[in-house]
């Protein structure tokens, strides 16, 4: 049997479960998960290597109207990804009542792309069979899909079937990455994303989306028993800084504790995490600040 390989983009409106699905399929946390929209800011690759295939999943930023240069960057990243992959997984919620404005916009964008597509109805464990069939019919009138699969990424229901459908549609090709690689992003990027996830989970309103993380230090001690990490949380307003720090520093301490615990699980070593908070006004409209915070504008 010929070996297959290829790049698979995950697209869908915010919070339909793109990151949850990629993390489940890869078997490791690669992309951050939050109930808030616009959680993913970069195209993040998750790599799954099987005996007969290597699948590189790309979790694209959620499609949304841009409000600043960071938003424009996110849209460009998503558009560029769709043009370069071998297959697109268009993810919607099986509990939807129909096609809303978000999905109408995505459908119009996908009509411009000839790449093969699979419709993925996520959260099918929460939906009736009748609703699933209705959605299949509605979406099929809008786009041509090579396959339609209903899944539940949270518990893996039908994910094996989805993998089989993906492999069927991928071309024959080489292994692009080593067998033990599950992502191509730097460790410092993963650290920044975990910290940002904890901010998203603990804070509300506009504060989390005005936050950027700079990793100042990432180094193992000589005896390799402790990983020292120093990071600066940048926000856009003094009032946001006060919220992130919290009364008596309690919120920052909580964010740091949650991030440290997860980082220790990921790296398998004790982590000494130090966090600072600084204000950099309007950084999401500042190209130099965006570059400093790790957004590779050259790619788009």
Swiss-Prot record:
Region feature (G3): 59-62
Residues where GTP binds: 12-19, 59-63, 122-125
Positions of the UniProt region annotated as G5: 151-153
Residue ranges constituting the KH type-2 domain according to the UniProt record: 195-281
Annotated CDD domains: Era, KH-II_Era
Localisation per UniProt entry: Cytoplasm; Cell membrane
Highest taxon of source: Bacteria
Coiled-coil residue windows: none
Pfam families assigned to the protein according to its UniProt record, in alphabetical order: KH_2 (PF07650), MMR_HSR1 (PF01926)
GO CC term, one of those recorded: cytosol
Keywords noted in UniProt: Cell membrane, Cytoplasm, GTP-binding, Membrane, Nucleotide-binding, Ribosome biogenesis, RNA-binding, rRNA-binding
SUPFAM superfamilies listed in its UniProt record: P-loop containing nucleoside triphosphate hydrolases (SSF52540), Prokaryotic type KH domain (KH-domain type II) (SSF54814)
GO molecular function: GTP binding; GTPase activity; ribosomal small subunit binding; small ribosomal subunit rRNA binding
G1 as annotated region, ranges: 12-19
Record's function text: An essential GTPase that binds both GDP and GTP, with rapid nucleotide exchange. Plays a role in 16S rRNA processing and 30S ribosomal subunit biogenesis and possibly also in cell cycle regulation and energy metabolism.
Listed NCBIfam families: era (TIGR00436), PRK00089.1 (NF000908), small_GTP (TIGR00231)
HAMAP family per record: GTPase_Era (MF_00367)
Protein name as catalogued: GTPase Era
Species of origin: Caldicellulosiruptor bescii (strain ATCC BAA-1888 / DSM 6725 / KCTC 15123 / Z-1320) (Anaerocellum thermophilum)
